Amino acid sequence: MAQLKYISGFGNECSSEDPRCPGSLPEGQNNPQVCPYNLYAEQLSGSAFTCPRSTNKRSWLYRIPPSVSHKPFESIDEGHVTHNWDEVDPDPNQLRWKPFEIPKVSQKKVDLVSGLHTLCGAGDIKSNNGLAIHIFLCNTSMENRCFYNSDGDFLIVPQKGNLLIYTEFGKMLVQPNEICVIQRGMRFSIDVFEETRGYILEVYGVHFELPDLGPIGANGLANPRDFLIPVAWYEDRQVPGGYTVIDKYQGKLFAAKQGVSPFNVVAWHGNYTPYKYNLKNFMVINSVAFDHADPSIFTVLTAKSVRPGVAIADFVIFPPRWGVADKTFRPPYYHRNCMSEFMGLIRGHYEAKQGGFLPGGGSLHSTMTPHGPDADCFEKASKAKLAPERIADGTMAFMFESSLSLAVTKWGLKASRCLDENYHKCWEPLKSHFTPNFRNPAEPN
């Protein structure tokens, strides 16, 4: 595969032309009477026209035929995609899933859309407020099929297998330890090269942003220059049997046929684009004196709610770093949280739980449900020599954190057959160390 090219930056005003058609972007205006190369001008809006400039999202696409040229949409089977948060009764228990099983290609060919499974979520699509967490399990590429999401943005986290993603803006190669965001309404198709697995965070009605840095300053965490946007690429391809365009609309799937590939955008400009990011570029902030800092310091992207400082969803990672805090229990502390915490593992192990939490699996600690290090981790960390040490080398755990109370789907609790019924047992060996007559040796007599 030839090396793909990208544009660097987050949320930038960008422009790109396929080099096969120089001068394909109109000069000085968006929709001339006749576009260069006799292309059609089409605007893709990601925000209301009247949003402030700082939040206004739109791009202009110059394409061979316009997107409107298709047959009517018809409802199709949703498979395991759902936005019904009342399928099963609520469950406040700590939940952990073993690695989700990828179907064997010898048994059945499954592409990313067919292999999409909703695990949990909350909120309402029709009012543009909420989120869903999906697992994708696939073994074959999307052939003459593309997908777009009318309901929200997808943040895609591949765990196993590379994704070659065709979009209307160009192509992206996304590998494990990278993420990508495909925003609302953007059509895409994904090629895979092996049995493939990953996680998707979907948010309704908002877009992902870089978190505010506050006293950290102008630089740090995920730096804008490390986000990559594809460059224009098109194919002028007729599809005699029809190309299938799949739309997720109000939580249901619909399909329409058209005669050509939708990836026919010769040039584009704007600030509403797909993008990718390599997690190795995250600049870690950590405590260098004492105590365990709150995990918000590891936020890569946030989707803000209307309440200041409160997110519909945060994407947080736990990257390789130095641990140097003195007089401190260094693993994550025991916690009860007003937020919901879903965790996944791309590779390696998670520092607070060496066993049971495996790559390709997940865990959900719901609102106010207690969680924290397992018994083995507590005993070791309480007695460890506090020398500077590397933490999480060779690993990458992540968290989708939300202010919403997440409901688990029927597939998540039952049909996936991956729920670990023994998860609670990792805390059972925790014992009391209470010493009523304890005296701190540092205190004077």
From Swiss-Prot:
It catalyses: homogentisate + O2 = 4-maleylacetoacetate + H(+). The keyword Endoplasmic reticulum does not apply. Catalyzes the conversion of homogentisate to maleylacetoacetate. GO terms for cellular component: cytoplasm. Its cofactor is Fe cation. This is Homogentisate 1,2-dioxygenase. Fe cation binds at H335, E341, H371. The modification N6-succinyllysine is found at K414. The modification N6-acetyllysine is found at K98. GO terms for molecular function: homogentisate 1,2-dioxygenase activity; metal ion binding. It comes from Pongo abelii (Sumatran orangutan). Its EC number is 1.13.11.5. InterPro entries: HgmA_C (IPR046451), HgmA_N (IPR046452), Homogentis_dOase (IPR005708), RmlC-like_jellyroll (IPR014710), RmlC_Cupin_sf (IPR011051). It is an enzyme of class 1 (oxidoreductase). Homohexamer arranged as a dimer of trimers. It holds the Pfam family HgmA_C. One of its GO terms (biological process) is tyrosine catabolic process.
